[in-house]
Amino acid sequence: MEAEASGRNRFLFISNGHGEDAIAAAVAARLPDTVAVEAYPMIGSGNAYAGVCPIVGPRATLASEGWRNVKGSLRRDIATGGLATVPPALRFLRKVNGKYDRVVVVGDMVGVLACYFSGHRGLTYLDVYKTGAARLYSGPERWAIKQACKTVFCRADNLARTLEHIGVDARSAGNVMMDAIPYGDYDARTRRSRALAVTLLPGSRALTSESFALQVDALRSLPAEMRPDVFLAVAGSVSVDELARKTGLKRTPMLSVEPSDLGELSDGDLTIHMARGGAMGNLLATSDLVLSQAGTATVQALGLGKPAITFVNPRDRRSRFTDEQMLFGEARTVVTADAPAIGAALRKLLSDDEERRRLGNIGRQRIGGPGAMHAIIDALMG
């Protein structure tokens, strides 16, 4: 095998989404130098791997960007040529079968199934999709996992138990999302001037600018004396110019030398401090709550004890949204997709310190803490 001939262990990370890329990159970055790592982001640019490891495999884009929380996303992907992305992915995976000492799948069953159908076995699977609060693994999912995977890391004990019962080495060692919160070179605290702060997490996909505009309208509805400091985590695939255009805000020049600083958006009344998504942890550390339409980032914010306000878009796939809410509970406040409703939820939380603390504690308890990263690295290097 090529991996054996090189004298150096070769690992391939396969991920299928922005949040999944970030988690996989965080794991890869913690591996020792004795491991040569490559990454195959199945969807999107894979920007999260920049500076961590080389990217391999065909690039693919989908209308949904892999986001299955929106109704009809699969139909739209198929209608816009999404099926055409499957053959190149399977060809690549067949071509590299046997060339890596370890293949690590991060995400949902898409990566596992792609590997199964291309002949890969003995996978390490980091399931960051299923929460254990609603649906467990289906019969076909359990069968595919047993065939293709050697070790599975689950987010919940009940998920791991369902796999253990069929002979799979399944573990629940903590929430790897909490180990993978990104921190960068950005001093959010020195930008604070008000009593409270809010971080905006509008997401990383097609609806980002639309979501951001609603969040900004809600902030504008607040009385001046209640306005918090506002921070925005900008995912790598998001256009700041589009965010500015959608909201009527103007981008100010970047004044600091911090690599993660993206300047400000302002209209003279409302100012939003922007940082790269790679510094999201910095923003959350100094914030009291979040307005979030994101996936992975919402989980991470709740796990840090930051209550979230999320609005339901008419296009959201309600089954997935409901499954998530069973896990998040009261820690995530859900409102309709209009600025007055979002603004009312904001006013309530900004004016009630005790309620924020209560919801923050619920989030920490529901999401669970870090710890999975150490177990994952041990398993990969064992």
Task: Label every PLM stretch briefly.
Residues 1-382:
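Nucleotide-activated sugar donor-binding and catalytic core shared by glycosyltransferases
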